[in-house]
């Protein structure tokens, strides 16, 4: 462990889904210019990673350059800290138990009874300190998933309690994000849930240094004093985290409330946050939110419409473009399971995102056909590219039975599999972490929309797929007006397609939304919106 390593631990209380990831990323941003900050997310589920979890249940799966499939909070970490995270930074209980069982089989515990304490907590600690060492970290931001009191995160809570004992109280600070409700009809803020949450944390041996109150309005002085008294913190250490028009306001709000000063005092360090550029971009977002200079309406035609977080990074990509083009983008998620052309008539542009399986498949094809025939700016992502190829094959090339091998029925081969399984996938049976995953180079063809947007002929983008365009059909597609504008580095796999005669009809096999930054929006989203103006 590095000497003078500083650690910030963020826990959540009352309810989940109130923004621990954004809160953690916002605090980390205040320290990123003065310290080498490494964010760590601890998840209590027994999955090795979220790669096989339904997005409707857990939110989108975020893919890293190293091929790791991690929690969506890593999207916030990367975007707020402008770094490329590593899959090892996402510690799941599934990974920990797997390592414990492997160690036991190898005899590393020398015949001792393997127990939750000390063996599991020691493994978590070892993993955390290994990350700090390998990254030469000066500060760790450790976010513990779920809420205090959940059975799933008890061992993570116990681990950070032990870490405090080992590193000393001057090198670690505990931040508790809680929810202060204002029940409808009562019109009064209630502190009792926060009190109970903090008491649960106290029983585990942790006493927060900072309480961040998630609420719809600024806390009243009365509630602030009440929380301070019952939770044993200074009233100045209770921070407002109210509803905002954009999450990029939150680091600025924390800065204005002196979060960095409170934590710096606790850790005996100096920090000088730089928020000028972020403040400028947030100012543009807010001004257009209230008095828009121009409004662009975008349809996101997705199959996981039950949960907005299923497409969180696409939403963020559009926010980044809006800030840089000084306009307002209104995005609407349309369920592709129940989509017809009338749903699309009021939109300036259409996005068809990724997904798996046949559900919602034909609805997406309807959206693609509508965009192509009506010259509406279109961006297809991953499955969106594959379905764009199928739509073109059916409705332009006349291959009416064109389809993907993903829809293959056993013992009934497709006559025209214009999308087929990647060769390296044919012998793979396991589902978890077996796709083409992570950052790969893409070679762009000159004089194409993609080349003009990127300004270079070689780019790195992130992938998550098993299927590809069948090269046997590419000549036919190009004769009919659909070109391949980007290939894999060996020129064997189509990665980008375009229809040059359309204003903007582009689809990519990769996920451009995974590398967007507010200071540097993803190029394909930028091109889409510019085409809509």
From Swiss-Prot:
<feature type="active site" description="Nucleophile; for glutamine hydrolysis">
    <location>
        <position position="382"/>
    </location>
</feature>
<feature type="binding site">
    <location>
        <position position="73"/>
    </location>
    <ligand>
        <name>Mg(2+)</name>
    </ligand>
</feature>
<dbReference type="InterPro" id="IPR004468">
    <property type="entry name" value="CTP_synthase"/>
</dbReference>
<feature type="binding site">
    <location>
        <position position="355"/>
    </location>
    <ligand>
        <name>L-glutamine</name>
    </ligand>
</feature>
<protein>
    <recommendedName>
        <fullName>CTP synthase</fullName>
        <ecNumber>6.3.4.2</ecNumber>
    </recommendedName>
</protein>
<comment type="function">
    <text>Catalyzes the ATP-dependent amination of UTP to CTP with either L-glutamine or ammonia as the source of nitrogen. Regulates intracellular CTP levels through interactions with the four ribonucleotide triphosphates.</text>
</comment>
<feature type="binding site">
    <location>
        <position position="226"/>
    </location>
    <ligand>
        <name>CTP</name>
    </ligand>
</feature>
<dbReference type="InterPro" id="IPR017926">
    <property type="entry name" value="GATASE"/>
</dbReference>
<keyword id="KW-0067">ATP-binding</keyword>
<feature type="binding site">
    <location>
        <begin position="190"/>
        <end position="195"/>
    </location>
    <ligand>
        <name>CTP</name>
    </ligand>
</feature>
<feature type="binding site">
    <location>
        <position position="406"/>
    </location>
    <ligand>
        <name>L-glutamine</name>
    </ligand>
</feature>
<keyword id="KW-0665">Pyrimidine biosynthesis</keyword>
<feature type="region of interest" description="Amidoligase domain">
    <location>
        <begin position="1"/>
        <end position="269"/>
    </location>
</feature>
<feature type="binding site">
    <location>
        <position position="226"/>
    </location>
    <ligand>
        <name>UTP</name>
    </ligand>
</feature>
<comment type="pathway">
    <text>Pyrimidine metabolism; CTP biosynthesis via de novo pathway; CTP from UDP: step 2/2.</text>
</comment>
<dbReference type="GO" id="GO:0003883">
    <property type="term" value="F:CTP synthase activity"/>
</dbReference>
<dbReference type="InterPro" id="IPR027417">
    <property type="entry name" value="P-loop_NTPase"/>
</dbReference>
<dbReference type="InterPro" id="IPR033828">
    <property type="entry name" value="GATase1_CTP_Synthase"/>
</dbReference>
<feature type="active site">
    <location>
        <position position="513"/>
    </location>
</feature>
<dbReference type="InterPro" id="IPR029062">
    <property type="entry name" value="Class_I_gatase-like"/>
</dbReference>
<dbReference type="GO" id="GO:0042802">
    <property type="term" value="F:identical protein binding"/>
</dbReference>
<dbReference type="InterPro" id="IPR017456">
    <property type="entry name" value="CTP_synthase_N"/>
</dbReference>
<dbReference type="GO" id="GO:0046872">
    <property type="term" value="F:metal ion binding"/>
</dbReference>
<feature type="binding site">
    <location>
        <position position="16"/>
    </location>
    <ligand>
        <name>CTP</name>
    </ligand>
</feature>
<feature type="active site">
    <location>
        <position position="511"/>
    </location>
</feature>
<feature type="binding site">
    <location>
        <position position="73"/>
    </location>
    <ligand>
        <name>ATP</name>
    </ligand>
</feature>
<dbReference type="GO" id="GO:0044210">
    <property type="term" value="P:'de novo' CTP biosynthetic process"/>
</dbReference>
<dbReference type="Pfam" id="PF06418">
    <property type="entry name" value="CTP_synth_N"/>
</dbReference>
<dbReference type="Pfam" id="PF00117">
    <property type="entry name" value="GATase"/>
</dbReference>
<keyword id="KW-0460">Magnesium</keyword>
<feature type="binding site">
    <location>
        <begin position="17"/>
        <end position="22"/>
    </location>
    <ligand>
        <name>ATP</name>
    </ligand>
</feature>
<comment type="similarity">
    <text>Belongs to the CTP synthase family.</text>
</comment>
<feature type="binding site">
    <location>
        <begin position="190"/>
        <end position="195"/>
    </location>
    <ligand>
        <name>UTP</name>
    </ligand>
</feature>
<feature type="domain" description="Glutamine amidotransferase type-1">
    <location>
        <begin position="304"/>
        <end position="533"/>
    </location>
</feature>
<keyword id="KW-0315">Glutamine amidotransferase</keyword>
<comment type="subunit">
    <text>Homotetramer.</text>
</comment>
<dbReference type="GO" id="GO:0019856">
    <property type="term" value="P:pyrimidine nucleobase biosynthetic process"/>
</dbReference>
<feature type="binding site">
    <location>
        <begin position="150"/>
        <end position="152"/>
    </location>
    <ligand>
        <name>CTP</name>
    </ligand>
</feature>
<feature type="binding site">
    <location>
        <position position="466"/>
    </location>
    <ligand>
        <name>L-glutamine</name>
    </ligand>
</feature>
<feature type="binding site">
    <location>
        <begin position="383"/>
        <end position="386"/>
    </location>
    <ligand>
        <name>L-glutamine</name>
    </ligand>
</feature>
<keyword id="KW-0547">Nucleotide-binding</keyword>
<keyword id="KW-0436">Ligase</keyword>
